[in-house]
């Protein structure tokens, strides 16, 4: 998180007259990579056009095409397009910098796929730049996305598996592999994920969310990928664009969906455009460093000052992460096309948007609407990190907000539930409002949300302390959490390693980012253990690689979690059913998922004593239920007052009406 806002800001939104003063961090390390091979076109040289973005486009798209063209003095040129009917220049927009043009291109309905040529003319001289207009995949616009039927597996690629050691350190990229450093690059890559897709499928996951894979070429701490230096290229230490598309294809072959993590809010201070931005207000500029105040309530607080709102949405996320100005229509169009380009080019299934409330909310609503206009069934989940339920609900599209705002954001991350799970499960002698009652209380506020099915529920991710640490390294509590993730409303996300109770390396504390993002044992040649295999899990013991369980416990946790999520895949009553829950008693919690055909009963004993299930308390829904099956054992289950549930354990029973 960034530091409190500094004084002396320029208050206007369109700050075109100020001198751009940059922190010098990382600019020297920025490398500008041409978007094409200049040798491929004899009369186009790299000093005339250094890049054109988007890199390509398609016929049959709803989004009008606007090309960002960069080249020294390019604004002095006229632009036309040749190569066939149906593709033409509609308008040429000049920027503040003479080294950019924004060219509006019409791709008519009769345009044919193929290579066209952008012709740049000046003083009787001209040169050409090849540009591909491809045919869309059949059914691309109607593509499906992640839903309540999915379980999402979150991977931090640098820490998952190293499938290609040859790209660990790359010339021109100063941050080299250093596996002994918690904030260094460890060498995980796209090939490593491809190599372990079977493990992910075996766990029961149906979708993968990777933290950003696009280029982050700052001098240090680049492993996380959240400071982009080139939006259209995969970081070479992870692979390349073609390998990323292969990864998506191979995942689809195994019925795994791919969700891309994107960050329109901020770019790296070493991004290629920072040496010469198209417009003076391309990003938010202050006379001294000004971080966001992170007061998200200013977006919906009727009493908030404009000053506080401005600093919240315009302040920088970090000194190395500049805040993009989405109020500039060319910036907004850039990010709309960029998102659509990756969906179409790589065949993506969803987006996770980082730091969603940091953005200017109205342009981001337009961004969401543009993506949904192109792909009506596409899903986007936004990271709106707040434990205030009304504030969280405000960001979900379709909500009847008093100010009339509609984000068009379909899905949100359930941070209130995340915090309630972690706090409640470790309170063995709870007072009023504590223990498992915390979870009951969170669900009692479900009336606030517009669409409960589009809630991402999660017990941990790459930004929060390891689940194993939060639950005090108690595997029974981990099992309770996994059972709740598999049976509650919404769709679950599990952070890689939590299914094995990874813990932080505790470099400073359990919440330290470098420490909690531990390497997955078995992902590197020479690792002492391989937790990707059943044999490796069975033999796993305490070590220094983020695992702290007795021998055999890793296998037990994995098998428990895998069984649950494999079972969940086909349970429509979980995906789309209603919920009925009952007030907690003695740190126990009972809830039912039900529809016209099926009922699933979940009983959580979070106490330190065995408990008899109070069936009469649940008569409203349980009366008459017969022929139950214990989900974990497959054995028949009958309602009986003699049923005892062990301390810190969970019972799941399914019935057919």
Predicted regions span which residues?
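C-terminal motif of bacterial Sec signal peptides marking the signal peptidase cleavage site
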Residues: 28-29
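Beta-strand/beta-sandwich contexts
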Residues: 34-76, 129-138, 142
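Immunoglobulin-like IPT/TIG beta-sandwich domains and homologous Ig-like subdomains
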Residues: 61-124
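Low-complexity, Pro/Ser/Thr- and charge-rich linker/hinge segments at domain boundaries
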Residues: 133-154, 159, 163
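Substrate-binding/active-site clefts of carbohydrate-active enzymes
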Residues: 160-345, 364-374, 379, 384, ...
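Loop/helix patches that line or flank the sugar-binding groove of alpha-linked glycan CAZymes
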Residues: 163-181, 185, 386, 452, ...
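Glycan-recognition surfaces
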Residues: 374-460, 519-539, 548
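C-terminal beta-strand-rich structural cap/linker in extracellular carbohydrate-active enzymes
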Residues: 638-657
């Amino acid at each position: 998180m960034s530091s409190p806002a500094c004084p002396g800001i320029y208050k206007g939104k369109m700050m075109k007259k100020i001198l751009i003063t940059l922190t010098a961090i990382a600019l020297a390390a920025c490398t500008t990579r041409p978007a094409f091979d200049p040798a491929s076109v004899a009369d186009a040289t790299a000093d005339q056009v250094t890049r054109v973005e988007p890199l390509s486009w398609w016929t049959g798209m709803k989004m009008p095409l606007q090309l960002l063209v960069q080249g020294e003095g390019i604004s002095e040129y006229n632009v036309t397009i040749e190569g066939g009917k149906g593709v033409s220049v509609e308008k040429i927009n000049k920027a503040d910098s003479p080294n950019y043009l924004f060219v509006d291109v019409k791709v008519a309905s009769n345009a044919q796929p193929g290579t066209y040529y952008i012709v740049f003319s000046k003083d009787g001289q001209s040169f050409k730049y090849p540009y591909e207009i491809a045919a869309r995949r059949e059914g691309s616009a109607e593509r499906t996305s992640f839903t309540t039927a999915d379980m999402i597996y979150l991977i931090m690629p640098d820490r998952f598996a190293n499938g290609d050691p040859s790209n660990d350190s790359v010339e021109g990229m100063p941050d080299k592999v250093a596996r002994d450093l918690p904030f260094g690059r460890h060498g995980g890559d796209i090939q490593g994920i491809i190599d372990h897709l079977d493990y992910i499928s075996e766990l029961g996951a149906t979708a993968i969310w990777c933290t950003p894979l696009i280029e982050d070429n700052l001098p240090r701490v680049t492993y996380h990928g959240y400071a982009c230096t080139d939006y259209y290229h995969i970081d070479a230490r992870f692979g390349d664009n073609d390998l990323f598309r292969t990864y998506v294809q191979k995942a689809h072959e195994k019925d795994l969906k791919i969700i891309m993590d994107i960050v329109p809010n901020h770019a790296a201070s070493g991004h290629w455009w920072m040496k010469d931005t198209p417009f003076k207000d391309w990003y938010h500029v202050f006379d001294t460093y000004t971080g966001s105040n992170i007061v998200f309530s200013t977006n919906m607080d009727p009493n908030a000052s404009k000053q506080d709102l401005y600093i919240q949405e315009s302040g920088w996320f970090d000194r190395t992460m500049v805040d993009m100005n989405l109020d500039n229509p060319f910036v907004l169009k850039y990010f709309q096309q960029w998102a659509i380009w990756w969906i179409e080019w790589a065949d993506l299934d969803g987006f996770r948007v980082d730091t969603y409330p940091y953005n200017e909310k109205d342009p981001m609503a337009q961004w969401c609407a543009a993506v949904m206009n192109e792909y009506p069934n596409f899903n986007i989940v936004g990271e709106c990190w707040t434990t205030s339920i009304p504030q969280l609900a405000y960001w979900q599209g379709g909500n009847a907000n008093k100010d009339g705002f509609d984000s068009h954001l379909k899905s949100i991350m359930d941070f209130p539930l995340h915090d309630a799970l972690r706090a409640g499960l470790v309170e063995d002698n709870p007072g009023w409002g504590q223990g498992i009652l915390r979870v009951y209380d969170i669900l009692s506020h479900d009336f606030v949300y517009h669409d409960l099915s589009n809630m991402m529920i999660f017990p941990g991710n790459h930004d929060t302390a390891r689940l194993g640490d939060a639950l005090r390294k108690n595997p029974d509590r981990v099992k309770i959490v996994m059972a709740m993730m598999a049976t509650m409303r919404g769709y679950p996300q599990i952070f890689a390693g939590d299914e094995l109770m990874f813990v932080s390396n505790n470099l400073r504390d359990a919440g330290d980012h470098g420490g909690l993002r531990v390497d997955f044992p078995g992902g590197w040649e020479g690792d002492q253990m391989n937790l990707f295999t059943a044999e490796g899990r069975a033999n796993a013991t305490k070590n220094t690689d983020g695992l702290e369980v007795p021998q055999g416990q890793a296998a037990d946790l994995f098998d428990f979690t895998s069984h649950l999520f494999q079972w969940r895949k086909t349970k429509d009553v979980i995906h789309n059913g209603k919920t009925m829950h009952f007030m907690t008693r003695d740190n126990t919690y009972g809830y039912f998922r039900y529809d016209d055909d099926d009922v699933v009963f979940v009983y959580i004993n979070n106490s330190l004593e065995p408990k008899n299930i109070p069936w009469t308390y649940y008569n409203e829904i349980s009366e008459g239920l017969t022929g139950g099956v214990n989900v974990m054992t497959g054995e028949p289950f009958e309602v009986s007052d003699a049923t005892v549930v062990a301390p810190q354990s969970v019972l799941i029973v399914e019935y057919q009406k």
